C-alpha cells in the first residue's frame, strides 16, 4: 500500500491518520 501511503502524505495529517487507522484495524502494519 505504498500508493495509499504516498496519497496520505500528500493529503496531509488527516490522510496519514486515516491510513494509519485502517492499517491498525486490519493489522497491516
Swiss-Prot record:
One of its GO terms (biological process) is neuropeptide signaling pathway. It comes from the Eukaryota. The modification Alanine amide is found at residue 29. One of its GO terms (cellular component) is secretory granule. It is found in: Secreted. Transmembrane segments: none annotated. GO terms for molecular function: galanin receptor binding; neuropeptide hormone activity. Keywords: Amidation, Hormone, Neuropeptide, Secreted. InterPro entries: Galanin (IPR008174), Galanin_pre (IPR008175). It holds the Pfam family Galanin. The keyword Ribosomal protein does not apply. Belongs to the galanin family. Contracts smooth muscle of the gastrointestinal and genitourinary tract, regulates growth hormone release, modulates insulin release, and may be involved in the control of adrenal secretion. This is Galanin.
Amino acid at each position: 500500500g505504498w500508493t495509499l501511503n504516498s496519497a496520505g502524505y500528500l493529503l496531509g495529517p488527516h490522510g496519514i491518520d486515516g491510513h494509519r487507522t485502517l492499517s491498525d484495524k486490519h493489522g497491516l502494519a
